[in-house]
Amino acid sequence: MPHVMVDGPCTVEQFHTTFTAMQWTVEGAILKLRDCFLNTTREEVLVEAVVVEGKRMQSFFISLSQRRTGVIAKLPIVTDPEKTEGVKRLIACVGGLLKQQNPACRYGQTNLHPFLGES
């Protein structure tokens, strides 16, 4: 499952507070972050995402979960898009947004290394 851990002083609550809808076009694919939802314990955010690659559109959520050492961005079990380059790239972009919260943040465990230089 594609994921990226951002270690350091980042929080899902700050991500939610500063969130704005975004759209990128990368290598012909359209990547969108449309909305985000903070749960009542303030430890998890669901980000509504859309990827359009060619004629195929996929709508799904990206889960941000607060951990002791930082935040992990991944696909929740209830959403199951095809793990295309665009889906992986968008999860990496969310990791990049988390990392930008504080200069002390860094990438931790991930299987998205090829996409992290783009975020």
Language-model segments: residues:
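Ser/Thr-rich, low-complexity intrinsically disordered terminal regions
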Residues: 2-71, 76-119
